Design a protein with these regions (language model features):
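Short, well-structured N-terminal submotif of metal-dependent ribonuclease cores
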Residues: 1-39, 53-67, 109, 119, ...
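Alpha-helix capping/helix-boundary segments
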Residues: 8, 43, 82, 102, ...
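A short acidic, helix-capping loop that chelates divalent metal ions and anchors anionic groups
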Residues: 10-12, 48-50, 84-87
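Active-site neighborhoods of divalent-metal-dependent phosphate/nucleic-acid chemistry enzymes
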Residues: 59, 70-116
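Short acidic-hydrophobic, aromatic-tinged amphipathic segments that line or gate anion-handling sites
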Residues: 76, 128-130
């Protein structure tokens, strides 16, 4: 299983050319081996918020995009273990709560996070692919 950061899920749906070769390879391998590709439930919130504020332009209504995501991805819930770990990440980790929850999800699940976010990758708190 792999976990996609919010922007990676959006790019995969809307503009796959923005993905790195390594990210595409990891996603293709997961699909070929019938492994789960997951996103955090907070990514849905982030996407809905971005669409509502006009910061991302979707080809389809956000509800339809979420229907596509439900078919394509495993949506990972925010559990008490994830919430606790997100709150306990070191202060050197980026402070954005959504980033912390997404990284903690990868850590609790024991899976790599596909992200272009250099702050998360530099923190080395979780295994990342980019």
């Amino acid at each position: 299983m792999i976990l996609l950061d919010t922007h990676v899920a959006l790019w995969l749906a809307l503009d796959p050319g923005k993905l790195s070769r390594l990210a595409v390879s990891a996603i293709d391998l997961a699909q070929a081996e019938v492994l789960e590709i997951a996103i955090s439930c907070v990514s849905l919130y982030e996407i809905a918020r971005l669409a509502h504020r006009g910061r991302v332009e979707l080809d389809v209504p956000v509800e339809e995009l979420f229907d596509q995501f439900n078919l394509r991805f495993s949506i990972r819930d925010l559990t008490p273990a994830i919430a606790l770990l997100a709150a306990q990440l070191p202060s050197s980790f980026p402070g954005d709560p959504m980033d912390r929850i997404i990284a903690a999800t990868a850590m609790v699940e024991g899976i790599p996070l596909i992200t272009a976010d250099q702050r998360i990758r530099r923190s080395r708190t979780t295994k990342t692919i980019w």
